[in-house]
Curated annotation (Swiss-Prot):
Subunit-structure text: The complex is composed of two ATP-binding proteins (HmuV), two transmembrane proteins (HmuU) and a solute-binding protein (HmuT).
Stated family: Belongs to the ABC transporter superfamily. Heme (hemin) importer (TC 3.A.1.14.5) family.
Pfam families cross-referenced by the UniProt entry: ABC_tran
Domain of life: Bacteria
The entry's keywords: ATP-binding, Cell inner membrane, Cell membrane, Membrane, Nucleotide-binding, Translocase, Transport
Protein known as: Hemin import ATP-binding protein HmuV
Topology class, membrane: Peripheral membrane protein
Keyword match Methyltransferase: no
Principal EC category: translocase
Record: residues binding ATP: 44-51
Amino acid sequence: MVDTAVVDTALLEANQLSYHVQGQKLINNVSLQIASGEMVAIIGPNGAGKSTLLRLLTGYLAPSEGHCQLLGKNLNSWQPQALARTRAVMRQYSDLAFPFSVSEVIQMGRAPYGAAQNRQALQEVMAQTDCLALAQRDYRALSGGEQQRVQLARVLAQLWQPEPTSRWLFLDEPTSALDLYHQQHTLRLLRQLTLEEPLAVCCVLHDLNLAALYADRILLLAQGELVACGTPEEVLNAETLTRWYQADLGISRHPESALPQIYLRQ
């Protein structure tokens, strides 16, 4: 049994979550906790159920069994506006059919607040995500990586508050289209925010080395089950990764942090 216990100040708690469609169980008996100030990475092979789990943890899907609580309250009991001010979700794909400017897309994140302090919030998150130079461009004309940065700015705008407030941010592969600089910049930013604010970040990552460098804890999902949970040192070992990824790989050490780094054998 995987030990997923963290500190008593858990921001989110999932208890025995299962989800099935037409007799097929996509998520099976997953329990976990995520604490304020934590950065958690969800990893796993293709088809493991990572995106489905993310949707269960954010209330976009109702579990077939089990329940998920945010700040001690079941997700389905939250009022939509209050939930939108407390948690934000960056999905893997966010296409738009209409000619919105970048600033208009980011401003959509402020919908739960009306006009309250929008200008300050937008300027701050656009600067954080390197989007200021993109502000007046048509979102549809951006590269995939630029669109990802805009979507990150949007969800950060959604959670922006003038005073420290417990918040919850979920991201589905937020670095998949980014170049090396912006991968590093994005994960450094998220890490910094969890250290400075009462913010919990949980993101799906395919790059195990990025997960090792920036996550406090890693959740390994396989075949819909949580098969490993712990620090990068505890989860990212050759035996565990070879078993669940079925890849011929090895583990080395980062020359500066000594954290595990994964390489594929030729």
